[in-house]
């Protein structure tokens, strides 16, 4: 078995729930995708149907059913998919894929991310250098931290099995699987991996690999869902 099997793309995400399926299928681990998001968006955007998408500014493609509030700021390259909502004062810094029916809310900032379909980051969230799976949801004020305080390259660690993989990347946020729920005002530290269907309690500081189908109450109190 390869290292950190639970961290593989195939075990975190339903790839049928993202326009980035073709990109993700090329890699084993999700953090390997991060350096390639920009190029993929530009290549994909040029192929999108002009009957369905409008290029509202250079390298920013928005589906005609998406709702963009007037005070939202969107830089490219970015793709915003069908029925997505970008609310007031949202700040999309580019290199962002916002999936179908996704919500990017008030004062939420995105940078170098893939949001699968039906993701919600609705209130005061920061999501950078991260991938959020189908129906993942962040409570108000929850953020991904994408750079270590010592500025060293991020290492993915499972503190239970002591397995680890060097990403060789300085900026890695969080990789959250499908149906992950992150409670209000939580911090997902650099290189955090949260398995499918896992809930994170509010006010948590999370690091390392959190297994699927669990409830994270604190770093020393993680229980299986019943």
Sequence positions of predicted segments:
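Glycine-rich hexapeptide-repeat left-handed beta-helix
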Residues: 20-22, 115-117, 122-226
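Terminal amphipathic alpha-helical/low-complexity segments used for targeting or macromolecular assembly
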Residues: 1-59, 64, 197, 203, ...
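Conserved hydrophobic/aromatic pocket- or pore-lining residues that grip, position, or stack substrates
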Residues: 29, 84, 113, 136
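Glycine-rich active-site/cofactor-binding loop and its immediate structural neighborhood
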Residues: 62-64, 68-107
